[in-house]
Amino acid sequence: MAKKGIREKIRLVSTANTGHFYTTDKNKRNMPGKFEIKKFDPVVRQHVVYKEAKIK
């Protein structure tokens, strides 16, 4: 069987409280902290900060 990978799936949730989110993965070894990135939120039609959250 294959070894479990180092990358973990995460959810990027909009800080504009629209409920919109992106899913992606990140390398746990290179980025151990919480991930934040500015991306486009189609609900408010603006670029807003997205913060990392666990996938349920």
UniProtKB/Swiss-Prot annotation:
Annotated transmembrane regions: none
Domain of life: Bacteria
GO cellular component: cytosolic large ribosomal subunit
Key words of the record: Ribonucleoprotein, Ribosomal protein
Pfam family, any one: Ribosomal_L33
Gene3D superfamilies: Ribosomal protein L33
An MF annotation (GO) of this entry: structural constituent of ribosome
One of the GO biological process terms: translation
Membership in a protein family: Belongs to the bacterial ribosomal protein bL33 family.
Family matches, as HAMAP family: Ribosomal_bL33
Name this protein carries in UniProt: Large ribosomal subunit protein bL33
Gene it is expressed from: rpmG
